Amino acid sequence: KTQADSFSWDGKAWHVKCSKMIEKGGNLIPSEDIITYVAEHVVTATGNHVQNTANLLNTKIAAIPVEHQYIVTEEDPKLIEYRQNNDEHPVLRDADAKWYVREERGGWILGPYEKNAPARFEYKVPENFRADLFPLDLDRIEQEYLSFIKRIPSTETLGIKDDFNGPICYTPDGN
């Protein structure tokens, strides 16, 4: 495991200086062991911090954090019955209705792919932002929720156990 500390472009290749990570007290921290990678292409996986990464690279990246709401249902007796003879239920994606659903502790997680979800952190994630959540706006995902109930009828009478609204990184067109 490594952490990228700095990078530079010499006109032909990237030079990426990294620290090897070590575990200390249950956390990964950088060690004194430094490695430099030389590469023609660098792929970043910085998610919501993509604009911070773009600034470091002195470039623009067409991705931005947007609000992503999802709900967790109470246990579904039909799903629990299914699990008595089967492995975990496969993830379902309804491309037309724009949502995914997966098993979660005997219930379901419904995550809509919202068109025009509000953008967050257009230029940089605030330094003090960790895993904070945004205010819910469940009206925005009502149609996806109704479609989910139609697709999986056993969910119609289930209560909502949890709901979340946090950032997820997408391209500006929401795809």
Task: Give the residues covered by each predicted segment.
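A conserved short coil-to-beta-strand element within the FAD-binding core of flavoproteins
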Residues: T2-H15, S19-I22
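Glycine-centered loop/turn positions within well-structured domains
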Residues: D5, W14, V50-Q51, Q69, ...
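Core beta-strand elements of the Rossmann-like FAD/NAD(P) dinucleotide-binding domain
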Residues: K24-H41
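Short hydrophobic core segments
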Residues: Y37-H49, T53
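Glycine-rich beta-alpha-beta "Rossmann" dinucleotide-binding loop(s) and their flanking helix/strand
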Residues: N52-Y70
